[in-house]
């Protein structure tokens, strides 16, 4: 049974061309790029080429690219750098729907005397820019907001946000881990000061990422040690990972226009067909301002985990919109922030496509999903009894 992988917002397949580019740096070219000898110099050249490739994808200058180990490091580095550069300012603005790499840092900073404003979202997952405007003060050091939400695909009006942030003199950081390769970017004309990307979301290996730091932005490094990355990120460079990220960035730039069209068409077909065939389901998130590859659908009166287990039997990989873990039945913080009813929250499934997704794969999901939902609803003691479902959820949460 072949795998149908529709969980690309979690991670992506490494492109074969990326694997080919990496291999020599795992076998033949193993020197240290900081070394003075020719062998090390070859590695230094490879790192410079990759930096240029990443810069081209972002519409940035290569001197503005700092290689990191992942998106989480990039987010941490950007947030800490912004605060260290402005020690007199103690206020941060973010949103309720950020990735934990941002939210948990902000929560920790609250214990260190910082004040954090968590902007709300509406039922479509969009921000109220008037709330942002009212939250900005002269004490605001940093505004950190994701470009696109990883669960719903909702895209925020980043340039409008950035314009308001810059008018108030704060640093603007954007977690673009989900946006890069799915939305064309041009940092040369952007209001963004710092921007995070992660390799494994764009068909590069895990363990490599990059942080864009606009020229002129004061930057204090998170990792202290050697002189690597022009003193902005200490530690011997992960050359194979960097080469892989560079190649992946080059490929994303080549394929982005055709990928957007293909993914949008396949996503819309999947979404519209499931909505037509399955009663009591709805799309979670903004259906106009969103990533081309992402749909999050709530199937009422059943658990998302049960849907995922059923899909898994057919070799179909997706993700639950519910962040349920052992011992907890609380759904994802993103969907809760949107104010969705429990009947939808718990049965939400995210399908996230990529340029490798095929028509036949979408056909297969369309074929099996109606039967899965019908069977699970038949097993549910509540079926379409919304009051009974809500009562059961309240009782469960009351005994946690």
Swiss-Prot record:
[2Fe-2S] cluster binds at residue 324. One of its GO terms (molecular function) is metal ion binding. Gene3D superfamilies: 1.10.260.50, Aspartate Aminotransferase, domain 1, Type I PLP-dependent aspartate aminotransferase-like (Major domain). It is an enzyme of class 2 (transferase). It comes from the Bacteria. InterPro entries: Aminotrans_V_dom, Aminotrans_V_PyrdxlP_BS, Cys_deSase_NifS_bac/arc, Cysteine_dSase, PyrdxlP-dep_Trfase, PyrdxlP-dep_Trfase_major, PyrdxlP-dep_Trfase_small. Coiled coil: none annotated. The active site is at 324 (cysteine persulfide intermediate). Keywords: Iron, Iron-sulfur, Metal-binding, Nitrogen fixation, Pyridoxal phosphate, Transferase. This is Cysteine desulfurase. The gene is nifS.
